[in-house]
């Protein structure tokens, strides 16, 4: 029987730290399952080099890891100050001026990069700058100038972000830079593309259309960052159904809805994504102290563990691996926490979709197989022989504590399944069909020391290998050799 394998996946962001020495290979060997290219930072050439190097390492290590391109989106920012920063006191009047030159900010006013901001605001609106560290109340709007009173002061430096409490800013989800980066993502051949600040399903549909037009079939991740996206259950479901996965980007989302609300929203988003057969990534400041320190705080350990207990498919590292001093150590620490949390019995039981009508034969096979896995004593693994990865995804929506092996001859499919909770991608190419192919798959997994004599496994497959959407069979087989 296979020893316990970590089920929750780890997304690691690439950057200057992973460019050094052999740090990129180290984070892969330490347990990174998805490599994120953050298009908010770095040049297109840097991203191309990182993607090329990552693929070379994957080939060398014979492993399957997903590449994720992350669009910057319409991050609304102040411009620059003459002296780089100012100090705002409580009750000061401070002006955000759309007409002010980019580098002429002073103690009284600063420019803004989103010129339509005055049109989106009303008197008494609260603006949150620098992730909420500075708070301003709108007291007057005159043409292009927003007059505010400082509620919470402090140091304000160049190019800090602006959010509106409760959301409602109308900036388009896809900027001109994003459209260029979609082409870059296609050239790099990413497996996933994350769309920042989508307000509704239409933003994601447009991104998918542009991606396909550029020649890519990458899957779309909706980054949940705006208050509008979580306004009610209907808004949440519309966003999730229009994407292939969601990323709970807790930084901007927490600023817009408040940290206290964020706790319940995180759980609701993960629960809804799983219910709708979608993938959920929990992100932002998960082990931020490890940017400078070799060990996480206990609060960070609990945060990661709770994301695992909530049912996240993956937990994400940002600056910790991109620019931190301890990139591989951070991945190792996160992996340990995930495995620890996964020992909790309550997360290995699921009633997912037991009371709903299945939408396809594939889903019926996947759900019945997982029901059998959870109720037949002695099952040690699930094997899904898959062309597109869809059956592997659906089986991974039910929590069982058992490893799910996704076997495919398509490397793109294997890369996609690297993000799914509990799924282990394995390259497999057979000219056999039916039980002969199933037995070949078992032999391969035995050779790789994943299965052992007398193990009991469930195999899902189609009658004919090599056809997408044809999974119609589930077998329970005993390993004998």
Swiss-Prot record:
- InterPro entries, A to Z: Pyr_Knase, Pyrv/PenolPyrv_kinase-like_dom, Pyrv_kinase-like_dom_sf, Pyrv_Knase-like_insert_dom_sf, Pyrv_Knase_AS, Pyrv_Knase_brl, Pyrv_Knase_C, Pyrv_Knase_C_sf
Please give the PROSITE patterns that the UniProt record associates with this protein: PYRUVATE_KINASE
Provide the E.C. number(s) assigned to this enzyme.
Answer: 2.7.1.40
Residues that bind Mg(2+)? 225, 252
Record keyword Kinase present: yes
The alphabetical list of record keywords is: Allosteric enzyme, ATP-binding, Glycolysis, Kinase, Magnesium, Metal-binding, Nucleotide-binding, Potassium, Pyruvate, Transferase
What does the record give as cofactor?
Mg(2+); K(+)
> Is Nucleotide-binding there in the keyword field?
yes
Q: Where does K(+) bind?
A: 38, 40, 70
One Pfam annotation, family name?
A: PK
One example of the protein's molecular function in GO is: kinase activity
Q: How does this polypeptide assemble, per the annotation?
A: Homotetramer.
Describe the family membership recorded for this protein in Swiss-Prot or TrEMBL.
Answer: Belongs to the pyruvate kinase family.
Record protein name field: Pyruvate kinase
Name the gene behind this protein.
pykA
């Amino acid at each position: 029987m296979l020893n316990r394998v970590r089920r929750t996946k780890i997304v690691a962001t690439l950057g200057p730290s992973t460019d050094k020495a052999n740090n990129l290979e180290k984070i892969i060997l330490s347990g990174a399952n998805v490599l994120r290219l953050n298009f908010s930072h770095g040049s297109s050439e840097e991203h191309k080099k990182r993607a090329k190097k990552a693929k070379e390492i994957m080939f060398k290590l014979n492993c399957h890891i997903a590449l994720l391109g992350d669009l910057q989106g319409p991050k609304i920012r102040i411009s620059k100050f003459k002296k780089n920063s100012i100090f705002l006191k409580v009750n000061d009047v401070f002006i955000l001026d759309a007409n002010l030159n980019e580098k002429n900010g002073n103690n009284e006013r600063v420019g803004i990069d989103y010129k339509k901001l005055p049109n989106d605001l009303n008197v008494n609106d609260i603006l949150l700058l620098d992730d909420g560290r500075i708070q301003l109340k709108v007291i007057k709007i005159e043409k292009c100038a927003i007059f505010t009173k400082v509620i919470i002061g402090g140091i304000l430096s160049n190019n800090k972000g602006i959010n509106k409490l409760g959301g409602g800013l109308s900036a388009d989800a896809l900027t001109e830079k994003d459209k260029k980066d979609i082409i870059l993502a296609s050239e790099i051949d990413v497996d996933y593309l994350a769309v920042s600040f989508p307000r509704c399903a239409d933003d994601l549909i447009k991104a998918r259309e542009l991606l396909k037009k550029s020649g890519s079939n990458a899957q779309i991740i909706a980054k949940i960052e705006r208050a509008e996206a979580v306004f009610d259950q209907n808004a949440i479901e519309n966003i999730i159904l229009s994407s292939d996965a969601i990323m709970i980007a807790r930084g901007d989302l927490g600023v817009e809805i408040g940290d206290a609300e964020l706790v319940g929203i995180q759980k609701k988003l993960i629960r809804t994504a799983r219910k709708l057969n979608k993938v959920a990534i929990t992100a932002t400041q998960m082990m931020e102290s490890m940017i400078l320190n070799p060990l996480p705080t206990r609060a960070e350990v609990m945060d990661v563990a709770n994301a695992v207990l909530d049912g996240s498919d993956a937990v994400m590292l940002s600056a910790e691996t991109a620019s931190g001093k301890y990139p591989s150590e951070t991945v190792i620490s996160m992996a340990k926490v995930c495995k620890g949390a996964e020992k909790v019995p309550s997360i290995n039981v699921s009633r997912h979709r037991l009371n709903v009508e299945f939408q396809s034969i594939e889903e019926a096979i996947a759900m019945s197989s997982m029901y059998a896995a959870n109720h037949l004593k002695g099952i040690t693994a699930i094997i899904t022989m898959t062309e597109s990865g869809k059956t592997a995804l659906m089986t991974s929506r039910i929590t069982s504590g058992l490893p799910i092996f996704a076997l495919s001859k398509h490397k793109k499919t294997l890369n996609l399944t690297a993000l799914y909770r509990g799924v282990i991608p394995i390259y497999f190419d057979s000219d056999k069909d039916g039980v002969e192919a199933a037995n070949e798959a078992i032999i391969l997994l035995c050779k790789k020391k994943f299965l052992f004599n007398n193990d009991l496994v469930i195999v899902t497959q189609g009658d004919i290998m090599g056809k997408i959407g044809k999974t119609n069979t589930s077998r329970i087989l005993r390993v004998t050799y």
